[in-house]
């Protein structure tokens, strides 16, 4: 029976991993579809936002055949492709930490119900439109290799701020400039790891580590929802660091 139990555990773990992988692929495909719409073209060569969405999907090992199948549908007028709309939910986590939740959904009622349930289960509260959005500002973020040449190029191209994180350099830009700067960095031979437009907190909230963990459990539960693409928070990252 012990052997049977061991294999049952492995099977359950594999099933859980397969489910998580399936969700990741689905989220990337939705992001590709949204990028095609937002960037104005279903053709990657004419849409830098779409190209970057595809690159992000490939970095997470989304099968190229899945991507190509979706692109063919979009390039054929979208027939057969799911129609998603972006919805933003605003609310508070325990400790008064603000959350912005971005979802792509084909069913508003289902998504709202799931998001509300997660907030309630983890001690948060779902707010109304505008209740926390004012605490964030849109920023472009380009993550690239951290070299002196990359730093000089980023400044020359109009970066708002630079943040060194080991081998990576995070370049903050105006939201409308992120993709232009990323492409210009690539043209200068700089290796770009990621580019996106995010909601950046204007101020952060510091909490004791145990309270910060409650916030992160809420964030992770929201991110596990199929329809949720991004969760932004104004929790101070240092709140998650436990002193040795």
Swiss-Prot record:
GO terms for cellular component: cytosol. It comes from the Bacteria. GO terms for biological process: regulation of DNA-templated transcription. SUPFAM superfamilies: YebC-like. It is found in: Cytoplasm. Transmembrane segments: none annotated. Pfam families: TACO1_YebC_N (PF20772), Transcrip_reg (PF01709). Keywords: Cytoplasm, DNA-binding, Transcription, Transcription regulation. GO terms for molecular function: DNA binding. InterPro entries: Integrase-like_N (IPR017856), TACO1_YebC-like_2nd/3rd_dom (IPR048300), TACO1_YebC_N (IPR049083), Transcrip_reg_TACO1-like (IPR002876), Transcrip_reg_TACO1-like_dom3 (IPR026564), YebC-like (IPR029072). Belongs to the TACO1 family. This is Probable transcriptional regulatory protein TTHA0821. It comes from Thermus thermophilus (strain ATCC 27634 / DSM 579 / HB8). The lineage of its organism: Bacteria, Thermotogati, Deinococcota, Deinococci, Thermales.
């Amino acid at each position: 029976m012990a052997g049977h139990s061991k294999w049952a555990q492995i099977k359950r773990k594999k099933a859980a991993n397969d489910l998580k992988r399936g969700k990741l692929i689905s989220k990337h495909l939705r992001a590709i579809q949204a990028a095609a719409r937002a960037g104005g073209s279903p053709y990657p060569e004419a849409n830098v936002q779409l190209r970057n969405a595809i690159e992000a999907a490939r970095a997470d090992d989304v099968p190229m055949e899945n991507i190509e199948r979706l692109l063919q549908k979009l390039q054929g007028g979208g027939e057969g492709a799911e129609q998603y709309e972006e919805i933003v939910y605003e609310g508070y986590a325990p400790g008064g930490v603000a959350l912005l939740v971005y979802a792509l959904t084909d069913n508003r009622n289902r998504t709202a119900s799931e998001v509300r349930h997660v907030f309630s289960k983890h001690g948060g509260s779902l707010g109304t439109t505008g209740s926390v959005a004012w605490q964030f500002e849109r920023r472009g973020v380009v993550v690239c290799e951290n070299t002196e040449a990359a730093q000089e190029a980023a400044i020359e191209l109009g970066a708002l701020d630079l943040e060194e994180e080991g081998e990576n350099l995070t370049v903050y830009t105006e939201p409308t400039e992120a993709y232009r700067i990323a492409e210009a960095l690539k043209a200068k031979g700089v290796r770009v790891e990621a580019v996106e437009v995010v909601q950046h907190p204007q101020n952060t909230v510091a909490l004791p580590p145990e309270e910060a963990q409650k916030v992160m459990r809420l964030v992770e539960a929201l991110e596990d929802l199929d329809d949720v693409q991004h969760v932004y928070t104004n929790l101070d990252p240092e709140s998650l660091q436990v002193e040795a």
